Amino acid sequence: MKQTLLVVALAAAASAGAAVTVQAEDGVDKAGATAFDIRMFAGPPGAKAYACFVRRYDANHLAQHPKQKVSAMKLLVTAEDAPEDKTTNYSFRLGVTYRHRSGNFDSSGFCNHAIATDSGHEIRFECGVDCEGGGISVALSKDDKSAIARLSSIRMWNRNKPDDDASEELIAGADDKIFRVDRADTRECAELVTDRKELAALRHK
């Protein structure tokens, strides 16, 4: 199921993926969602848009956060028109490497707009992995130059192993609950994409 993106309930994503208090999609007004999309994708999304965020944690940061398991993170957020449903679908792909083990680990799922009632009612994305795989919450910094990813647990897959052998959980510890990842050229996130047509489109953005 690694490469299959299935729509999941927002409530499940919020409770399993990110420890925040949210209101569901129908509590987000259209103007607010549109404004958030423009911030996220650095302009109106159009038919399809990407936002890439990357962080490689340096030795100084890791020394200050000795319990942090993640040494690097890439986050790709996608918006795509679905004309037949008269709506826009949002999805995410997440890639991490760990500081004390080798390999690249990925996850993916669908997102919805949500209102975080515990932080000034800001709009963010609540994103979930299918089959109760947890998820993440994605907000933006005030200057829109970074994304703030929050999690409590999310299912990850080793990119180079069969699905049955590759699944594991990234569980938020003392230093793995909140990650700031910085906006980057979309080509920085190309390794997260497996579809050839989509990869070509991403590289030409």
Show the residue positions of the predicted features.
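Positively charged n-region of N-terminal signal peptides that target proteins for export
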Residues: 1-4
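Bacterial N-terminal signal peptides
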Residues: 7-16
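Amphipathic/hydrophobic helical signal segments and adjacent flexible N-terminal regions
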Residues: 18-70, 131-133, 142-205
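Disulfide-bonded cysteine motifs in exported proteins
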Residues: 47-48, 77, 106, 122, ...
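Short, hydrophobic/aromatic-rich segments at coil-to-beta transitions
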Residues: 47-54, 85-92, 121-125
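Generic structural hydrophobic/aromatic packing signal, biased to beta-strands
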Residues: 55, 73-75, 94, 138, ...
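N-terminal glycine/threonine-rich, aromatic-flanked beta-hairpin/loop signature
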Residues: 64-113, 188
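Surface-exposed, polar helix/loop patches in the mature regions of secreted/periplasmic/lumenal proteins
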Residues: 98-154
